A protein has these predicted regions:
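Nucleotide 5′-phosphate-binding alpha/beta core
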Residues: 1-129, 135-167, 225-227
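Active-site glycine/GP-rich loop and adjacent strand/helix microenvironment
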Residues: 1-63, 193-276
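Conserved AMP-binding loop of ANL adenylate-forming enzymes
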Residues: 161-196, 201-204
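Short, well-ordered, mixed-charge alpha-helical segments that flank or form enzyme active sites
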Residues: 148-149, 181-187, 235-236
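Glycine-rich, histidine-containing beta strand-loop boundary motifs that form or position
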Residues: 141-144, 178, 229-230, 275
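Short glycine-enriched loops at secondary-structure junctions
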Residues: 124, 179-183, 231-233
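Generic structural marker for isolated residues within well-ordered, non-membrane alpha-helices
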Residues: 127, 176, 260
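Short glycine/serine/threonine-biased micro-segments
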Residues: 130-133, 176, 274
Length: 276
């Protein structure tokens, strides 16, 4: 039998009493949705310490789309050529980043293990399935640190829009919004957001006791951030909750200008397009 989210020390090794209490409160509310699955950050304390250092460093770095201005690229390429089976056959005499051959989904579908670095312990690998925009599912290997480092770039983008995650006051830091007949949902905490809650919710009525519970749940818990793809966020916009998050993060597919304009009018907060 799986542990309740507020007692899930396997997926959240550093879960403390305050984080546990937050999760129990959010899951046990009368208007709460169905939480069908479980998930967590899986980070050990030394990895959280390293993440904090990485985030502080990244915050002060300039962002550039020019390969020559990103000093991390050459060391990263060197590691790939040395330790990732797929890249070991690449021509190591290539000088420019732009001259390396690209890959596509067919490369990933043939042998995904060829993209796992030799030195990574297999018991820390996360495998997840994604269909992208093609509808053809792929199993992708990842690692808890990879998932966690997204937070550093999200924080940086939020700061560009004058949103400081260190000033969040709600016990619910982030809602990841979905809208599907069947959806992976869970309650977790985010150690890189002061151990505040992170909820993946499905706003399809199937996952709620009553459609009105969706509005009541958001207004009661007041999430600081809401993230989702343009489709799920559009569906969410039609729910008449009054709460205004500090920012909306749009992911996974192109955010059209007209849709962005609708979000800005509806939410009255920065809309961050993390995909287009």
């Amino acid at each position: 039998m799986q542990a309740a989210p507020w007692n899930d020390y396997e997926r959240m090794p550093n879960l403390d009493e305050s984080g546990s209490a937050r999760l129990k409160h959010l899951v046990d509310q009368p208007h709460a949705p169905i939480f069908r699955n479980q998930s967590g950050h899986h980070l050990a304390q030394h990895e959280l310490d390293e993440l904090g250092h990485f985030t502080r460093e990244e915050t002060n770095l300039n962002a550039s789309a020019c390969a020559g201005e990103n000093k991390w690229i050459d060391p990263f390429l060197g590691k790939c050529l040395e330790s990732v089976p797929f890249y070991k056959h690449y021509d190591k005499s290539v000088q420019r980043f732009e001259d390396y051959p690209t890959i596509d989904r067919s490369d990933l579908s043939v042998s995904i293990t060829d993209f796992v670095p030799d030195h990574l312990p297999l018991d820390r690998i996360i495998a997840y399935e994604t269909s992208g925009t093609t509808g053809h599912a792929l199993t992708i290997p990842s690692h808890p640190i990879v998932a966690a480092r997204y937070s550093a770039y999200h924080k940086k983008a939020l700061l560009w829009n004058y949103v400081d995650t260190g000033e969040f006051r709600s016990d619910l830091a982030v809602i990841l919004a979905g809208f599907q007949e069947s959806c992976f949902t869970y309650a977790s905490v985010s150690p890189y957001l002061n151990n505040k809650a992170l909820l993946k919710l499905n706003f399809h009525p199937n996952d709620w006791g009553s459609p009105d519970d969706r509005e009541l749940y958001i207004d009661l818990n007041k999430p600081d951030l809401i993230s989702g793809d343009p489709i799920s966020l559009s569906e969410l916009s039609m729910i008449p909750f009054r709460h205004r998050p500090k920012a909306i993060l749009s992911t996974s597919m192109t955010l059209l200008k007209a849709v962005r304009d609708d979000f800005e009018s509806r939410y009255k907060c920065p809309i961050l397009d993390l995909y287009s």
